[in-house]
């Protein structure tokens, strides 16, 4: 367990935690993103949080996958992939902030800000030049969160789930 603030820890996700992660994402994703999808986000959650996909993501080299713990309760997940390059950027050392999902009851409490600040400090310490991520521009709250922190728009992409 990594303590990044007195009330916030990162707990590594293990293969034995898959069911817990899946349940957590059913609590988090549909309330925030259901209006994007005809099926209220079921396809996305079932696809991205299938046992098979989680095992692939847990085994990926240079990836770290955590539960976010706030006040001793698991309230989200956070995943980074070191040395993951964004097409079109020339900087050698890049890290992808792949996932940061927090339960709606803990939003606007500084948890996301604290986690992103911790990642930025880790990147600086490891001499990384770029942190990048994919954010849905239709999810205005998340998009503005990163924009306020100085992240810049790079390119528009479309999710392909075929």
Regions found by a protein language model. Give the residues of each.
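Flexible nucleotide-binding loop
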Residues: 109
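Residues forming the Rossmann-fold NAD(P)(H) cofactor-binding site
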Residues: 113
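Short amphipathic helical patch at the helix-1/turn junction of helix-turn-helix
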Residues: 102, 136-137
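Short glycine/proline-centered loop/turn elements that form peptide/ligand docking sites
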Residues: 116, 138-142, 158-162
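Acetyl-CoA-dependent GNAT
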Residues: 3-8, 12-18, 22-105, 116-118, ...
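Conserved GNAT acetyl-CoA-binding A-motif
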Residues: 116, 123-135
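Conserved catalytic-core motifs of GNAT/GCN5-like acyltransferases
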Residues: 134-135, 147-162
């Amino acid at each position: 367990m990594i303590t990044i603030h007195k009330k916030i820890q990162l707990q590594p996700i293990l293969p034995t935690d898959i069911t817990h992660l899946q349940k957590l994402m059913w609590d988090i994703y549909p309330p925030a993103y259901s209006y994007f999808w005809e099926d209220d986000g079921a396809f996305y959650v079932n696809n991205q949080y299938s046992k098979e996909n989680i095992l692939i993501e847990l085994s990926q080299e240079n990836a770290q996958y955590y539960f976010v713990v706030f006040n001793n309760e698991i309230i989200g997940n956070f995943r980074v992939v070191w040395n993951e390059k964004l097409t079109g950027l020339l900087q050698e050392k890049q890290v992808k902030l792949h996932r940061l999902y927090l339960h709606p009851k803990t939003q606007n409490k500084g948890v996301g800000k604290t986690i992103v600040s911790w990642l930025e400090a880790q990147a600086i310490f490891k001499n990384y030049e770029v942190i990048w991520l994919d954010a849905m521009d239709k999810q205005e709250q998340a998009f503005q969160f990163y924009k306020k922190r100085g992240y810049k728009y790079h390119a528009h992409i479309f999710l392909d789930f075929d």
